[in-house]
Regions:
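A cross-family kinase active-site recognition segment
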Residues: 119-185, 212
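ATP/Mg2+ or Mg2+-diphosphate-binding catalytic cores
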Residues: 311-358
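Active-site acidic catalytic loop and adjacent metal/ATP-binding pocket
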Residues: 27-37, 41-43, 80, 198-247
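An alpha-helical support segment within catalytic cores of ATP-dependent transferases
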Residues: 3-12, 148, 169-217
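ATP-binding pocket architecture of kinase catalytic cores
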Residues: 40-148
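Active-site activation/catalytic loop segments of kinase-like enzymes and analogous catalytic loops
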Residues: 246-288, 306-324
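A glycine-centered beta->alpha junction motif in the catalytic cores
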Residues: 86, 107-121, 171-176, 310-326
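Conserved NTP-binding catalytic cores of kinases and kinase-like/nucleotidyltransferase enzymes
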Residues: 1-85, 228-230, 356-358
Length: 358
């Protein structure tokens, strides 16, 4: 790709470009593996082209958090490769449908390890789930005391402020929803989705008692690299933000313990749930702060789990209705899964409280 070669030549001193391979597993950004030769030594890097519309302040936040994590001895996130001028990203003008647009690019070190799963794959080994829980705990511990640089930050609100905003885009989607299988399923369930959103409330007086810190925001098995049953890399911090720790944990539980198999689809697997939470808590006990799950976090875990699933469902809904020619069958699987899970979580609040140890 000529554009990548031009960016590398103009802004970096990484040597001669030998090969480029696009990574096709992402949904938002475009990523490439590149092989560079310098002084007869061949190195691999990851090149990211941020999705159109990404705000510069969000990239500044993401990169500052990555630097903080690595300085705090969390080395599982790949380091950023600075330009010759020291900046961590490249800002250029490209053409989109004939119109000039601003796009951002960044280069990361390449993390070796296995890409074993997508976010839909939950057949992880106990060792892999245990390691994932431990690593998320280490990430939260390292993320503390992060100072947000001026002019940086995630535009998306905190999860409990974000949920009430879902109604506005949903009302806009109804006019064209009946033309597709996804649209018809959305219309059939929209009132129930909005009703459950209204029920999923945690008061501010309770929220302020919970740990509030930088979170990954998209911690799933597809964003991790593995080696011999251990997590050896944590990728894709572009959804990171400052939010309640409990949301990050609940979101991870939705990903790591959800059942996708037909007979049990749309439910959570208790063994995987307890393995992940148990390993997270055990790892947290080794650090003074933020510590293991508090009694307040346990009390509202079922509610935050509902919020986390609604968050994932919302991503699928918005992506489907705003994409150009989305794959109806692909998104139907996402819609169906998270809708079933929405109802399962709603109907098993007492059971979930038992699982979390209330």
């Amino acid at each position: 790709m000529k554009l990548i070669n031009d960016i590398l030549k103009k802004n970096y001193r990484l040597g001669k470009l030998l090969d480029i391979e696009e990574i096709l597993t992402g949904y938002c950004n475009q990523s490439f593996t590149v092989w560079m030769e310098k002084n007869k030594f061949i190195s691999k890097f990851l090149v990211r082209r941020y999705r159109l519309g990404t705000a510069e302040q969000e990239i500044k936040f993401e990169h500052a958090l990555i630097y903080h994590l690595r300085k705090s001895e969390f080395k599982l996130t790949p380091d950023l490769i600075p330009q010759t001028n020291g900046n961590s990203y490249v800002k250029i003008q490209e053409l989109d449908k004939g119109k000039p647009v601003v796009r951002f690019w960044a280069i990361f070190e390449f993390v070796e390890g296995e890409n074993r799963y997508t976010w839909m794959d939950t057949d992880l080994s106990d060792a892999e789930i245990t390691s994932a829980g431990q690593v998320l705990s280490r990430l939260h511990c390292a993320a503390q005391n992060f100072l947000i640089p001026p002019g940086s930050g995630r535009l998306q609100p905190k999860i409990m402020d974000f949920l009430p905003t879902f109604q506005l885009p949903y009302s806009k989607f109804t006019n064209r929803a009946g033309k597709t299988k996804c649209g018809r399923l959305f219309l059939k369930n929209m009132d129930n989705i909005l009703a459950i959103i209204r029920k999923t409330i945690i008061s501010k007086s309770d929220l302020i008692k919970m740990p509030f810190l930088p979170i990954h925001g998209d911690y799933h098995q597809g964003n991790l690299k593995y080696k011999k049953g251990r997590v050896v890399g944590v990728l894709d911090f572009d959804w990171a933000k400052i939010d309640f720790r409990l949301f990050d944990i609940a979101l991870a539980v939705i990903y790591f313990s959800a059942n996708w198999e037909k007979k049990r689809a749309g439910s959570l697997d208790r063994d995987k749930f307890e393995t992940f939470i148990g390993s997270y808590n055990t790892a947290c006990r080794l650090a003074e702060s933020p510590g293991h799950l508090t009694s307040m976090e346990k009390k509202f875990f079922p509610s935050m789990l509902a919020a986390a699933n609604l968050f994932v469902l919302h991503w699928a809904i918005v992506n489907f209705f705003t994409a150009v020619n989305p794959n109806d069958d692909e998104y139907l699987e996402y819609f169906d899964h998270n809708l079933k899970l929405m109802y399962w979580v709603e109907n098993h609040q007492r059971l979930l409280a038992d699982w979390i140890g209330l």
